[in-house]
């Protein structure tokens, strides 16, 4: 008989094998993960493992989560062969954080999360506590095997930050398996933290200190005005304030101005043709007022890039990512909203079939043109502000187009099945735009 408690205990106990990452080479560890995948697929169902296989998986004929777990571990090892401490920490968050959240949520979860009633505050806190502790331990345990050894601040701070980020991602109401989203998020945060250097911080400390005061004042005023003007909800006000402070403190008024332009683009285009959108049932919720999830999905990566520009030695790449993320997000919003308001025929990029406006992933000629022009305008403003050289504008626009294509394809295929939601798609969109823009700049 299936037992969720037994499943989670096994899920958590598998983290003991992460201890081996201190003594194994990356290829030895990869072989072990591959062997675990074969074991879970072939041996486990025949060796009494049905007690930890959910009924839905049993009826399907294969245990999805139990197979994805070793695949995620294998990918972590392959992604960070020289930094197995990152793989071990992310593994600890996957095993202990995710497992503790389920057990605590089932046992003590009484306070539901506002954005996902299926998750609880107690479960989230258990995730962060257990996952953070496990990640710090594994980072410390594997540190002697890393050359050069990571700094103590990284061993302590980065895993905790990764646990918080992964815990929040785990609460997003989507069908994407936690065994994918949790380790991917944790590993991304740990990798970004590994790029931070004391030298970069020291070189920008004076400018950051000078920007903090104005950042607090300007963003408090802007966030309050946005809420009073009913352009954002309370969650959007708070998230926008935090993102704005990070961007202003890191990049000054030039970076913040570009962020504000992106927000203005989203606000204005959301209100264009609002009556028509409402009649068709495709208007943004609450009259286009942006929430916290929308704010982070569209501009969160830009805030991360802004911080990376002053905390890592990769300032140029970070600035390209910053401008590209905003241009991609702003252009995508313009494409979506103008397409729904004034677009003609709309088509799915995956099948070329004509569909009604507002269908996930659907594109129109008018919307696509508006998106490209919006991305071009934001990229050009980024160049005028001195954030990127003018010749990089085309790379940013190309990245924005690539992001839009990827988002449309994923929206048409994965969003209807709730594997991802609109906020996740928007974040993927901005990430794709930033990555493609950086790649183009590097090979140009």
Ranges and model annotations:
Residues 118:
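Short, acidic/turn-prone active-site loops that include or flank metal/cofactor-
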Residues 1-115, 124-335, 339-444:
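Hydrophobic alpha-helical transmembrane segments
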């Amino acid at each position: 008989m299936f037992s969720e408690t037994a499943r989670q205990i096994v899920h958590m106990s598998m983290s003991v094998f992460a201890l081996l990452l201190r003594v194994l080479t990356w290829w030895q560890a990869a072989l072990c993960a591959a062997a675990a995948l074969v074991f879970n697929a072939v041996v486990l169902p025949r060796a009494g493992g049905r007690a930890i296989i959910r009924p839905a998986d049993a009826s399907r004929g294969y245990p999805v989560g139990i197979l994805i777990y070793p695949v995620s571990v294998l990918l972590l090892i392959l992604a960070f062969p020289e930094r197995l401490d990152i793989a071990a920490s992310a593994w600890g968050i996957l095993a202990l954080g995710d497992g503790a959240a389920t057990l605590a949520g089932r046992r003590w979860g009484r306070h539901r999360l506002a954005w996902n009633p299926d998750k609880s505050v107690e479960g989230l806190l258990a995730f962060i506590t257990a996952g953070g502790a496990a990640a710090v331990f594994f980072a410390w345990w594997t540190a002697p095997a890393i050359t050069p050894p990571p700094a103590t601040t990284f061993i302590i701070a980065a895993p905790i930050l990764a646990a918080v980020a992964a815990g929040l991602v785990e609460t997003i109401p989507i069908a994407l398996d936690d065994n994918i989203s949790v380790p991917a998020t944790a590993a991304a945060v740990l990798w970004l933290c590994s790029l931070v250097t004391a030298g970069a911080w020291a070189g920008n400390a004076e400018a950051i200190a000078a920007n903090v005061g104005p950042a607090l004042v300007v963003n408090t005023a802007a966030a309050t005005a946005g809420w009073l003007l009913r352009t954002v909800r309370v969650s959007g006000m708070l998230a926008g304030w935090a993102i704005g402070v990070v961007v202003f403190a890191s990049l000054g008024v030039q970076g913040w101005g570009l962020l504000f332009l992106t927000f203005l683009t989203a606000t204005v285009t959301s209100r264009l043709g609002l009556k028509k959108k409402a009649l068709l049932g495709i208007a943004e919720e609450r009259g286009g007022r942006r929430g916290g999830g929308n704010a982070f999905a569209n501009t969160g990566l830009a805030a991360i890039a802004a911080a990376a520009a002053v905390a890592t030695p990769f300032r140029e790449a970070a600035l390209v990512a910053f401008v590209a993320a905003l241009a991609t997000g702003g252009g995508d919003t313009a494409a979506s909203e103008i397409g729904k308001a004034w677009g003609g025929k709309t088509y799915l990029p995956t099948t070329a079939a004509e569909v009604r406006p507002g269908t996930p992933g659907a594109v129109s000629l008018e919307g696509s043109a508006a998106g490209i022009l919006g991305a071009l305008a934001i990229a050009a403003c980024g160049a005028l502000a001195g954030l990127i050289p003018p010749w990089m504008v085309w790379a940013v626009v190309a990245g924005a187009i690539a992001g839009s294509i990827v988002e449309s394809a994923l929206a048409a295929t994965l969003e209807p099945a709730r594997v991802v939601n609109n906020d996740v798609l928007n974040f993927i969109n901005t990430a794709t735009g930033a990555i493609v823009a950086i790649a183009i700049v590097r090979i140009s």
